[in-house]
UniProtKB/Swiss-Prot annotation:
Disulphide linkage map: none
Gene3D superfamilies (alphabetical): 2.40.50.90
GO MF assignments: endonuclease activity; metal ion binding
Domain TNase-like: 56-260
Gene Ontology, cellular component aspect: membrane; mitochondrion
One Pfam family recorded for the sequence: SNase
Protein name as it appears in the record: Probable endonuclease LCL3
UniProt membrane topology term: Single-pass membrane protein
Signal peptide as annotated in the record: none
InterPro entries reported for this sequence: SNase_OB-fold_sf, Staphylococal_nuclease_OB-fold
Family recorded in the similarity comment: Belongs to the LCL3 family.
Binding site for Ca(2+): 156
Length: 276
C-alpha cells in the first residue's frame, strides 16, 4: 500500500481547521442575518423595511401620547425572548400621580423588577405601567427616546390646540382616553403607510386578558373619534366597513362627539383652519 493512500495526521488537522472555520463563519453570518431580520430594533419610521408594511407586526411599548390619535412607540422586537427587560433595557416612565395603596398594588410599575409574573406580563404584552379608573395618566410620557411616531389608522380624533388655534370640543377627553389606554402599555403595531408628517399610519392592537382590542375601533366606540374622512391616504387594513359600523353605533347612542349639538368633524375643522 502506497504512502499517499492514507491521510497523515497533518492533513486531517488541516481539513478539520478548514471545516470548523467554514462552520463558525456560516454560523456567525446566519446569526447576524437572523438578528437583523427578527431582533434588530427599529428606531425611526424611515428605517421600517418595506416588506414589513401591511404584512408584519412590530411589538413595543408606548412611551408618550401626543394627541387623541397618535403616540410614540419604543420597538422591543422579540419581547422578553428577545432579551428585553433582562439583557436589553426597556425605558421606564416617571410616576405622575399618587394612587391609594390598594390601587398602587394593582397598577404599579409592573416591569421594574424581574419577577416571573412581570416577565410573563412583558411576554404576552400586558401593561407595564398602570392605568386606573380615572382618566389621567399615572406616568409621564418620555419623548427623547429612539421611538417611532405612530398615527392610528382609520380614525380622526378632535383636534387639540396647536399653533395658536383653538381646540375642538372633547379633544382633551380623547387625549386623556388614549393616555389612559396606551401609555406604558405594550402593543402590536402593523405599519400600513407613512403620512405627510413622517408618521407611521398603523393598525394598533393590544391584549386585554380576554381578547385582542383594536385601538382605533375602541376610540370609535367611545365616540371620541370619527372615521377618517379623506379620500386619499385613508388606511383601514381592509376593515373600513367594521369601522363605519362602530361609528354608526356610537352616533345612534349619542356618545362623545355625537352628543354635541353643533359638531364639526376634525376633517372639516382642519379645512377651515387651513383657509384662514
Amino acid at each position: 500500500m502506497s504512502d499517499n493512500s492514507v491521510a497523515t495526521p497533518a492533513h486531517l488537522l488541516q481539513a478539520k481547521v478548514i471545516f470548523l472555520s467554514f462552520l463558525l463563519t456560516g454560523g456567525f453570518v446566519a446569526t447576524y442575518s437572523a438578528f437583523n431580520r427578527h431582533l434588530r430594533q427599529i428606531t425611526s419610521v424611515h428605517d421600517i423595511p418595506t416588506n414589513v408594511f401591511r404584512r408584519k407586526y412590530l411589538y413595543g411599548k408606548v412611551t408618550s401620547v401626543g394627541d387623541g390619535d397618535n403616540f410614540l412607540f419604543f420597538h422591543t422586537p422579540g419581547g422578553v425572548l428577545g432579551g428585553w427587560h433582562w439583557l436589553r433595557k426597556v425605558p421606564t416612565l416617571q410616576r405622575k400621580g399618587i394612587l391609594p395603596r390598594r390601587a398602587q398594588k394593582a397598577t404599579g410599575n409592573a416591569l421594574s423588577t424581574l419577577s416571573p409574573l412581570n416577565l410573563f406580563r412583558g411576554l404576552v404584552g400586558l401593561r407595564s405601567e398602570g392605568g386606573g379608573r380615572d382618566q389621567f395618566a399615572l406616568y409621564r410620557g418620555r419623548r427623547k427616546l429612539p421611538t417611532l411616531s405612530i398615527r392610528l389608522c382609520g380614525v380622526d380624533a378632535p383636534e387639540r390646540a396647536h399653533f395658536g388655534n383653538s381646540s375642538q370640543p372633547l379633544s382633551e377627553e380623547a387625549y386623556k382616553w388614549l393616555n389612559k389606554t396606551l401609555l406604558g402599555r405594550f402593543v402590536w403595531v402593523k405599519p400600513l403607510s407613512t403620512d405627510q408628517y413622517g408618521r407611521c399610519v398603523a393598525k394598533v392592537e393590544y391584549w386585554s386578558w380576554f381578547r385582542w382590542k383594536n385601538v382605533s375601533i375602541e376610540l370609535l366606540k367611545q365616540g371620541l373619534g370619527v372615521v377618517y374622512e379623506s379620500k386619499s391616504g385613508a388606511e383601514f387594513d381592509g376593515q373600513d366597513t367594521l369601522y363605519r359600523y362602530h361609528e354608526s353605533k356610537a352616533k345612534k347612542s349619542k356618545r362623545g362627539v355625537w352628543g354635541l349639538r353643533h359638531f364639526e368633524t376634525p376633517g372639516a375643522y382642519k379645512k377651515r383652519i387651513n383657509k384662514q
